[in-house]
Structures are given as structure tokens and as C-alpha cells.
């Protein structure tokens, strides 16, 4: 007997027919002799609809009250799915985040999991029940309900799998695995049978919407085997697991991130501590920095460029203009019409010529590179946003079809 945690997203439980489909998947897993815990998200656009309803009453509601409201979406899904499974004749119980003892900090709307008590889950499983859990939610030390922010249901599923020592955590989505590129851009993108935690983390951080990076980080930390599968087909999915015994591809995937902006601070004093002033200011205002480039000019001056999320561009411009005298720069430029395109591969660390092939593909496609960033398993380039789709296609062709 195996213990399997299955997570179903909003599209998978969006309506009655899809709930029946999920009930069929879950009960077939149980019929195969497995203990099953299911984590569900809110149906379809439920969360967005609740946010709209709140805004109609108050355009600045407290995060605490928003968490109370948004918790209801997952509770609707869990109870409806439990009813569908009851109809099929299986013993089942639905539980909220606080009923399973999922304890969080008090950072409303983006809480972090501290622990899951686990006793209630184990008791229900030992009694032969399928357990349905509302994802995305927990409870803080004051007894207030909280929500876990983006990717919260994925994170709930992995946390439960880690707590119970599950044999597998399956993430059901509207795609049947992890591909070498976005199939909507690259028609001949190939599905990967397996990928390492580190590769999946990089792809998730680059905007691949299959898994949220918080859940992958937790899976890696607690060595939880993941599988990405489709709710709508019975095709095999992609396994995400420790890569030590896997044959490592030089490049496993190509990804793009259009939520980028390039900040250039021009003609700063070329003296010790200048970079510290810039980036401590960004840290103070909780701005995430990605690629950094420093270039030395004339007359003891230098320029510093870095990339941020496009969502932060206006705020960062205001922060830097207010700090112009303190930083002592001559000019400031912010470009929001850029994109980051990256290749990821665990085998890259021991391979030669990977960067050369990537840059050749971009050159042949007539695409100019503005910034470059590398790590042991990733190479990223910043390019014009209008070239991002063409870049993904060209790089994918070079590495997977040449």
C-alpha cells in the first residue's frame, strides 16, 4: 500500500463535470490499494470573483479580512468533491487547513507554513477514508485563518506529503507534464519524463506555470517525489526528483519571462560602497533584483544596470529619483520593453559550448543581447520583448532539433 497526495488546481475542479472527473481519478487511485489525500484549489475564477466582490464594498480591505473571505473558495471545492466521491460509494472526509493543524505565521495573504500537526490526517487515513483538504489556507497562533499566497495549494500538497512521508505527490494541472518549452510557442516542444528539483526550480522562477517555486523548494528540502500530470488525459506525466542517479541533459528546457524591466543608473562615482548604496536601497524597499551588470566609464565614473520585475518599475523609478542626491548619479533609464530568455539544464555544469550554441542561435535569428547572466545550471539573456518568442523558437531548434 502506498500513500499518495494528489493536488487538483482550479481548472481541474472548475465545474460539475470536472469534479466528477477528479472524483473518478481519486477513487481509481484508492481502488488500486492506496491511501489518498487530495488537496484542492478554489474553482475556476472563484478567487478573482471574491476579490471583485470585496472591492465593491471596500477598495482597501485589511489582509486579515481578505484571508477570511478567500478561504471560502477552497472550502467550496473540498466539500463538493467529497460529495462527488460519496456518490461513488467511497468513505471520504473533507477538512480545512486548520482542521489538519496547518500552522502558519501571521503574514496575512502570503503566510508561511510552520508545521502540520498531522494527527487528524493520519487518523482519518487509518480509518480507511479518502481525505480531501482545502489548499492555500492555514491558521496562525492567534487562531486566525491565513492564506499562503501564490502557489499556496501546491505548497499545501507538498507540505502534507512531507509530514506524512508520502510515497508520491501528484500535481494535476491542465497540461500533462513539463515540456522543453512552452507548447503554445514551440509546437514541437518535447515532454520530459523526468527533471531534477534544481532544474524545476529554475524553470518555475522563470515563469513556467506548471509548479510554483515555493512548492519545489519544499519538495527538494524534504525529498518529496513529485509528478506533474494532466487531469484531462491519462498520459504519463513528468517526475520531479533528486537528480543524482539520472542522466543529465545539457539543456532540459527553454523559458521566457516577459515580466522584466531593465534599470540603468548612469555615471555613478566609481568608489567603494557605491554598489552597496544602490542595492541596500533596493533591499530596504523589498525589491527583488535579478541580473546585474556594472560598466566602468571615464573620469572615475561607472554605470550599474540591473533587472527587476516589470510590476516594480514605477516604484523603483520613484525610489531612485528621490535618492538621486544621495547616490550621486547623472541619469536614470528604465526600460520595460525587455524580456529574459533562459536555458536550464543540470548537465550544463560539465558540458562545453552550451553558451556558444545559445548565442549563435540568437545571432542567426538577428536578436541582440543586452545583458547576460549565468549559473551552474542556467544561462539567461536579456533581449527586446518583441524578440522573446522568436528567441525561444530559435534556441529550442538549436538544442532539440539540430
How would you name each of these model-derived features?
Residues 1-216, 307, 383-384:
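Nucleotide/pyrophosphate-binding catalytic subdomain
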Residues 34, 90, 224, 287, ...:
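Short phosphate-binding/catalytic loops that engage adenosine nucleotides
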Residues 224-235, 258:
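Active-site C-terminal subdomain of aminotransferase-like
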Residues 219:
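Acidic-aromatic/histidine active-site loop/patch
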Residues 41, 231, 294:
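Conserved H-loop
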Residues 237-402:
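A conserved regulatory-domain signal marking ACT and ACT-like small-molecule sensing domains
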Residues 168-172, 226-228, 290:
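Short hydrophobic alpha-helical runs that function as membrane-insertion/retention elements
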